[in-house]
Amino acid sequence: MPSSAARSLALAFGLALAAGLPAGRAVIFYSTSDPSYNTTAPTGSLANSGWQWVGTWEGFTGTPIAPNYFLAARHIGGAVGDPFVFDGVTYTAAAFFDDSASDLRIVQVNGSFPTWAPLYLGSSEVGSGLVVYGYGLSRGAAVYSGTRLAGWQWGSNNGVLRWGQNTIVATINGGSYWGQLLYAVFTAGGGANGCDLAQGDSSGPVFINDGTGWKLAGIAAAVDGPFNTTDTGGGFDAAIFDARGLYIWNSDTQEWQQIPNGPEPEATGFYATQVSVRASWIQSVIPSEPVGDAPLFSGPGLALLACLLLGTGAYMARGRSCIGESGWIR
């Protein structure tokens, strides 16, 4: 679970998400500032963990979930007629379907995808390791709390797709706009691929492995922040793995709130719209029979898709990285 401070901050932000949390933009790593890190598909135990299902939409990502439909974050925008590029092919947006209970948007395209991502339909996201994909900002200048390294500000945007890992530690109610969110925290012990999100990572797909393969469990939505080293001024967006002594903006009280200097690091993190709890809405949009000219799955993949489409299964940047603007990730 996240630290007590992180949990209380996340809940406080949940009450004000619609007013603007920082949206996400780019995958930022604890282990390295190398902008070329993790810019090719994962291999080994992470092979086929979602890279093959990432498309480009409005400068962010979109993820095919059916022959003629892809899933994205609503807050990044878009219009009918705009292009969606997937697997080297450009498709045209034909219609939008917005979820009234979350930040999700389903986009229908002209044409048919050769493959699409299976959805996670279970209820065991918490504790699961994840792989997340996004375009956006790299790691910038170091942030210190006194003499202690706390994290890094958001850097520049190189527009390159990257991937990272983390663990889902909680689900959080983000309020009427954002709905149910998966929460992952940025820590010093997250391994070589441990990451946070930033501006440009919004709409990035979050995949987990349920034992039968990698499934789409979330769509990147927002991040904790912004932060400050004092209680005045505009502050800054950052990936912070130890927020002790720093200030974080409280959208409810419209003031900087200092994070206590306790004995343990206070991690902050990112949020993704929880896909599983919106399964019935997704199923209401996607036709019960596949539409398109290319067979997408066979075997277990087809069985899983059939469960979703027939209704037998169960299921957060245009901006700045995860919950930004105080919060969403665009």
Where are the predicted features?
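A cross-kingdom C-terminal cell-surface attachment/processing module
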Residues: 299-321
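Short, threonine-centered small-residue motifs that mark membrane-proximal processing/anchoring sites
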Residues: 2-13, 19-28, 272-273, 283-305
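Cytoplasmic C-terminal tails of single-pass
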Residues: 321-330
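Chymotrypsin/trypsin-fold serine protease catalytic domain
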Residues: 110-200, 217-243
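Catalytic-histidine neighborhood of serine endopeptidases
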Residues: 66-67, 71-102, 112, 125, ...
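Short beta-strand micro-motifs in enzyme catalytic cores
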Residues: 103-107
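C-terminal subregion of chymotrypsin/trypsin-like serine protease catalytic domains
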Residues: 27-53, 60-77, 163, 195-291
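Short, surface-exposed loop motifs enriched in S/T, G, D/E and P with embedded aromatic residues
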Residues: 62, 88-97, 117-119, 167-170
